[in-house]
Regions:
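Non-catalytic cap/lid and distal C-terminal segments of serine-dependent acyl enzymes
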Residues: 1-178
Length: 178
């Protein structure tokens, strides 16, 4: 909605889900197996844990993504996983629901509105531990190919504690608003 927002800034955003999300599925599958593949049982246990493991945090992230990218609108308490929690096999119908929200997939469908933006800025660390720099590079190239004006910056850092990058994006957005 360029008529409402006019400008976008994105720091280390999820894009190119085959790299950004898919590699974390096996860890989530292994974690959920301890709960018979039941996300609700896992979440109930997480509420009482004093200290979360790294695998718990990644599983929480995958469940949050599942709830967002492929919600069960008739039963909002139910999380639809993009994989079989017992075998780990991808469920193509569910995974395709995720992919339709991938900025790489969405770009072509929104070219006209993207071109109307006064500012389209995104950046990512070149050592992003969640592999998001690959998706950012792909999106930058996609925008180039589609003729979408944008500014992409890659910086020497990872995914964490990058709020200093606001010093780059906020002035750009402020200029857009003025």
């Amino acid at each position: 909605h360029p008529d409402v927002w006019g400008g976008i800034a994105c720091h280390s955003g999820d894009m190119y889900f085959p790299y950004a999300c898919l590699p974390d599925f096996p860890m989530a599958i292994d974690t959920l197996r301890r709960f018979e593949g039941n996300p609700a049982a896992f979440l109930k246990k997480m509420r009482t844990k004093i200290k979360l493991r790294g695998s718990d945090i990644m599983t929480l992230m995958i469940l949050a993504l599942a709830a967002f990218y492929d919600p069960d609108l008739e039963n909002p308490d139910r999380i639809q996983l993009p994989f079989d929690a017992r075998t780990g096999e991808l469920i193509d119908e569910r995974w395709q629901q995720w992919l339709r929200w991938d900025p790489i997939q969405m770009a072509e469908d929104h070219v006209d509105n993207l071109k109307k933006l006064k500012c389209l800025f995104f950046d990512c660390g070149s050592r992003d531990q969640y592999r998001l720099h690959h998706g950012a590079r792909i999106l930058a190239q996609r925008f180039e190919d589609l003729g979408v004006p944008h500014r992409y910056e890659e910086f020497d850092d990872d995914h964490s504690s990058i709020q200093y990058r606001y010093d780059v994006s906020l002035p750009l957005l402020a200029d857009t608003l003025s």
